[in-house]
Amino acid sequence: MNARTQAIFDARARIIKALAHPTRLFIMDELSRGERCVCELAKMVDADVSTVSKHLTVLRSAGIVSDDKRGLQVFYKLRCPCVLGFLDCVQGVLKANAREHLELAK
């Protein structure tokens, strides 16, 4: 693998790694419905604002979400909604795995 190809796969891995946490997946699901402020998301996940802010920082650093500061509040939205297609694909894999396990259990 040459350096350019390695850099591309490293960048992809960073994005996938940013998604690899249940709380961040939940946040993504909520943001698919529209922008939310950190305080709303904190209530939804039953966590401190600081904890949710750290998760959002990971997602922002990966380029998945963008933020907009309005007064004392920070609102987040999906920067690239196409990432939801990837999450749909993950759900498809889960369904396929469940069917396979059911077949093996017969």
Outline where the language-model segments fall.
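Beta-hairpin "wing" of winged helix-turn-helix
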Residues: R60-R70, K77
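N-terminal helix-turn-helix DNA-binding core of bacterial DNA-binding proteins
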Residues: N2, A7-T51, Q73-V83
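Conserved segment of winged-helix/HTH DNA-binding domains
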Residues: A11, F75-K106
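Alpha-helical residues within the helix-turn-helix
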Residues: K43, K54, R60-S61
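Conserved phosphate-binding and hydrolysis motifs of nucleotide-dependent enzymes
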Residues: R24, H55, G63, G71
